[in-house]
A protein has these predicted regions:
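N-terminal organellar transit peptides
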Residues: 1-110, 116-209
Length: 209
């Protein structure tokens, strides 16, 4: 869970009109983005950066203003910039519309943190999802005093992440601190048993089941 920015991804634009395509040809990515937006479904795929956090936040605010119907977020991410994950986590809790998290592929590091922004009963995953929890990491150079400051910030971040995991899973803070000392991988079923996930689902219809 890096505490320094990674390379930003380009913003994804949502067009006002879907492009015309000849019969049988695949739709453009912008058309698919628009359809996903209208279905109140957001995607968090790939590394989490300030650019992707800005994009997700913009969409969450727009969907929240449009309706108080549930918003579904599909998450498949190895993590990334911790503070960008914090942004998504906090905005999900800030808006009025309920959000449902659906893990797929793998949900790791800072992505696990934002995944835990919703109550357990609204946390789902698909059968082959894997989860990773661990302590944040990062590098620092420069004067010894700056390195010491950075080390203290890493310690604070580790404790904050552990408290979030403990709060959302029902585990003790001490147990979580031990679990995240090293990389802890969990299968979908293990994530249910740990308290990260409420249910494993295979179809969208099961979200409201």
């Amino acid at each position: 869970m890096a505490t320094h920015p990674v390379k930003e991804q380009h913003d994804m634009e949502t067009p006002e009109d879907a492009p015309d395509t000849p019969a049988g040809e695949p739709r453009s990515s912008s058309y698919l983005e628009e359809k996903a937006f209208k279905s109140r479904t957001l995607l968090i795929f790939g590394a989490i950066t300030d650019a992707s956090a800005r994009d997700v936040t913009r969409r969450l605010i727009a969907l929240d203003a449009d309706s108080d119907a549930p918003i579904d977020i599909l998450v498949s991410s190895p993590g990334g910039h911790l503070e960008s994950g914090d942004t998504i986590h906090d905005v999900v809790r800030f808006i009025a519309a309920p959000v449902r998290m659906i893990g797929t592929g793998w949900v790791g590091s800072a992505a696990t943190h934002l995944y835990l922004a919703v109550p357990r009963e609204r946390r789902f995953c698909l059968p082959n999802t894997r989860f990773l929890i661990h302590q944040p990491s990062g590098g620092a150079g420069g004067p010894a005093s700056d390195i010491a400051i950075h080390a203290q910030e890493i310690i604070k971040a580790r404790e904050r992440i552990a408290r979030t995991i403990a709060r959302e899973t029902g585990k003790s803070f001490e147990a979580v601190m031990t679990d995240i000392e090293r990389d802890r991988w969990l299968s979908a079923q293990e994530a249910v048993e740990y308290g990260l996930v409420s249910r494993i689902i295979e179809r969208k219809s099961e979200l409201s089941g």
